[in-house]
């Protein structure tokens, strides 16, 4: 099917169209707290939401930059998927085989693609439209921080999706033209560690609980309890779908949860400082001497570990496959183009027992 504005543009349009209906549903018990579209520009000015918008625009450009450098760096850092295969084996394959169903595949694929983008966008928007600037701050900071923390793992610890490594595992997420084109254009397909579908949702839930504890109330009495349940329900679906669709390893959940713990604690602590900057000035956001020294020390330590232990390290062992499939399997992978002036060079080395046939397809000619 020919999508006039492409799969990504179509998804963004659906995201915008769903914002108000879902917000109205979740706030049906307190319509008086809603911000109308006519009043939204004034609400943005009065509550100082300009930096939220700027932050999301910055993250859009930053992600494009990271994805652009992901593939070229793999020549020096390789991949570590074989470590996870040695630990987990074919557990996710058994999950897929036990539940595989065409209707379930369609539902979970649509949910996986759309709902993650929707939660990224909707979380701060929900609180803005509900007149809760503190939680709007926390939701925006949550996405910013958890993605920033994940980037080093995405760039230096490449782990392929399970459908690219477990023989017999079907890439159910990429089963139709829409989702295939969406992920080829927007997903390097080797950013399994950590799972931000899990991490982002879990950190939002943790932030909610830190917030109500500070307020001295029960989560069940919180005015945003239905939104909390909405996030919780989506997290439950993700825990199953990331395995069923042939995307994440079970172990990917652990780093996602670890990122969530760090992100939630930091965001909860720093949000009052960020909110008070309007009275205290931008200088109040700068770290003190102790915090600066600690940050530099951690950055140097992590950078040294990456340069010594990862670059040209265990991940570039040519005898370890970074892509596997069984005899008779047909597997789709994407070759990313990063320059209009330089060709893409791809080397295929068969380290298995059976012959391999490779066919290159230009999507523009299909």
Residue spans of the language-model regions?
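Terminal transmembrane helix and immediately flanking juxtamembrane interfaces
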Residues: 1-157, 177-182, 212-244, 250, ...
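Membrane-interfacial catalytic/cofactor-binding modules of polytopic membrane enzymes
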Residues: 152-220
């Amino acid at each position: 099917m020919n999508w006039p504005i492409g799969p990504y543009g179509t998804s963004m349009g659906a995201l915008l169209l769903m914002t108000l209906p879902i917000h109205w549903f979740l706030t049906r018990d307190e319509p008086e707290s809603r911000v109308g579209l006519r009043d939204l520009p004034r609400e943005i000015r009065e509550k100082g939401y300009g930096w939220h918008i700027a932050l999301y625009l910055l993250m859009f450009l930053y992600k494009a930059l990271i994805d652009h450098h992901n593939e070229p760096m793999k020549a020096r850092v390789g991949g570590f998927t074989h470590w996870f295969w040695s630990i987990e084996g074919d557990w996710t394959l058994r999950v897929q085989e036990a539940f595989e169903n065409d209707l379930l595949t369609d539902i979970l694929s649509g949910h996986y693609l759309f709902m993650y983008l929707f939660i990224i966008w909707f979380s701060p928007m929900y609180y803005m439209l509900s007149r809760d600037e503190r939680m709007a701050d926390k939701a925006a900071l949550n996405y910013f921080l958890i993605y920033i923390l994940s980037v080093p793992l995405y760039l230096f610890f490449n782990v392929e999706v399970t459908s690219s490594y477990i023989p017999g595992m079907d890439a159910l997420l990429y089963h139709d033209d829409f989702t295939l084109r969406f992920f080829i254009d927007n997903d390097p397909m080797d950013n399994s560690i950590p799972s931000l579908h899990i991490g982002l949702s879990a950190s939002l839930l943790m932030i909610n609980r830190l917030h109500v504890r500070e307020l001295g109330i029960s989560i069940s009495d919180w005015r945003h309890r239905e939104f909390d349940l909405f996030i919780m329900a989506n997290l439950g679906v993700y825990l199953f779908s990331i395995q069923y669709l042939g995307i994440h390893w079970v172990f990917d959940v652990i780093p996602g949860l670890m990122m969530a713990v760090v992100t939630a604690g930091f965001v909860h602590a720093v949000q009052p400082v960020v909110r008070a900057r309007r009275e205290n000035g931008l200088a109040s956001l700068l770290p003190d001497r102790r915090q600066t020294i600690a940050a530099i020390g951690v950055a140097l330590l992590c950078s040294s570990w990456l340069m010594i232990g990862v670059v040209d390290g265990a991940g570039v062992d040519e005898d370890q496959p970074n892509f596997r499939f069984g005899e008779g399997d047909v597997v789709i992978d994407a070759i990313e183009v990063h320059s209009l002036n330089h060709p893409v060079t791809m080397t295929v080395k068969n380290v298995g027992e059976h012959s391999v046939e490779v066919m290159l397809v230009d999507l523009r000619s299909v």
